[in-house]
Amino acid sequence: EKAESALKTAVSAVATFSRLFGEYPYEYLSVAGSPGAEICNASGIYTVGEDQNESLFTDSVIFGAARQWWGGVVGFDAVNCAFMQEGLSEYSASVFYEKNANYSVSFDERMRDATLSYSLFVTELKPKSTAMQRKICDFNNETEYLFCTRLKGELLLHSIRKTVGDKAFFESLKSFYGENSGKVASPDCLFASIEKTCGKNLKSYSDSWINGNDVVGKT
């Protein structure tokens, strides 16, 4: 049953992301189950942990598919700029639900939950730094890593989308994907694509998030 569900979701994810970001370039996509909850990715294949409840399993299938675009076709420096693939993939997963109402997952609720979770992380755990662009070894633990790369990366992208509008935002992601396929892209490449499309200077704004000088979650 999980295998059939994963197949249907992966097919929907590939169709959605191909439409939004650019065509999936490989002839096949293989999704394999594995023990635990970890996702392992390679070009044209990824694994999904089977020891998860139904909603988390579905999230993992969608996130893994998004990683084929972000971290697969478009490469990133996963050691120093992990927030690129983590944030883009997580936000893509949320957008999948926005574009596929039959999954009955509210995009707006996901964004509210992400904002609340990040705020609690900042106020309750009081990390010394919320900088996104760090070497993996410079994060104190997995929780800090996930909140400062995946969750905060998603929130940054959503904030930019609200600033520039849907049309410019998704056009810029499609342009970014097309121009950087088969390459290793830097954060500057992403934000340059967005700025070029929307005609706004976002460098100081994005830098404040990346360097940890933003006010998200802070009181």
Residue ranges and their predicted role:
Residues 80-82, 86-155, 163, 180, ...:
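Acidic/His/Gly-enriched intrinsically disordered linker/tail segments
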Residues 13, 73, 136-137, 161-164, ...:
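Active-site and adjacent substrate-binding regions of carbohydrate-active enzymes
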Residues 2, 6-13, 57, 61-65, ...:
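Stable alpha-helical elements in mature extracytoplasmic
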Residues 21-25, 69-73, 77-78, 92-104, ...:
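A generic secondary-structure signal for well-formed alpha-helical elements
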Residues 1-81, 92, 143:
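Juxtacatalytic substrate-recognition/specificity segment
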Residues 23-32, 77-80, 103-109, 171-172, ...:
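Surface-exposed patches in mature extracellular/periplasmic domains of secreted proteins
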Residues 12-19, 68, 91, 95, ...:
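Residue-level signal for well-ordered alpha-helical scaffold segments within enzymatic catalytic domains
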Residues 104, 143-219:
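Amphipathic alpha-helical substructures
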